[in-house]
Amino acid sequence: MAGVLVDACGWVAVVDARINIDLSLENQVGPVELKVTEAVLTELEKLAGREARPLLLDLLHDRSEIVSGEGKHTDDELLNLAIANNWPVLTVDRTLKSRLHEANASVIEVHGSKALRLIE
């Protein structure tokens, strides 16, 4: 089973697009186990409180494993985990995607309005 790291903006994009995360990820990379960091969860909890919209955080908690890595910033931690474990990162953050590409790490992004796309 492949691991997929979840970035906060990637999760929000999936929720906003109402994408079936399990089916879409399985179509892209096969069976997956979502991986999320404490920093990403904190960002999502702040967003959920500030914007008063459902971000399906219970679903994320139930379906993911909490992981930790090195880095002073959330993006640094995600980048280091992606490289060390060969995990793609679910994100729509342009800066993070650029850093991942430079490091030859894979990205999963929301493509169009209803689909996920793996970029290796």
List each language-model region with its residue ranges:
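Nuclease catalytic cores that cleave nucleic-acid phosphodiester bonds
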Residues: 35-120
